[in-house]
Amino acid sequence: MTNSVFETLKKIGVTSETTKKLFNARTRDVEGLNVWKDSQSGVVFIDDFYTGDETYVDGGYRDDKSVELKTGKPDFERTNDAQRRFKSNLKFVAGKKIADFGCGSGDFLKLVNPFCQSVIGIELQQNYLDDLNAVGISCTNNLESIDDGSLDAIVSFHVIEHLPTPLETLESLKRKVVSGGYV
């Protein structure tokens, strides 16, 4: 059974039918994929985008869009996103043991790595996982391989809408951080 992001957010009390408002009728790269914003909590979310783990393991959904596959370098938007995330989140991760859940090619981890005690990526797409391990950034495809209470913070960008059971996954992530840690 898959739970929509909306249902998950409603269950934890950060949105409702009356406060959920259409924020945009598209994402940066997908026309017709609605982006919602809750008028009370400010939470922005995409609903119902889980396509199955196999899609994320082989990475085929990215092949036709990847400038990096053609040039060896990330595109401007991806680089810009990584820089913005770095600037916004360094204060939460500096000096800490962190993980990036759904880290993709590891752009964020590569930027924060020099400032953190340790970093680890959690990523299903095998070529990204292999590439990160090859450049010395630890990466796994198995959340359970990370000890409970071993991290200070876990970040995740544009991942929750791709999960079949978001609340269960968030609960699993929470177990991996120390008491008082961030998810």
Language-model regions: role of each:
Residues M1-F157, P166-L170:
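Conserved N-terminal segment of class I S-adenosyl-L-methionine
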Residues L167-Y182:
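A short glycine-rich, Lys/Arg-flanked "PGG" loop and its adjoining helix->strand segment in the class I
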Residues H162:
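Phosphate-binding active sites in nucleotide-utilizing proteins
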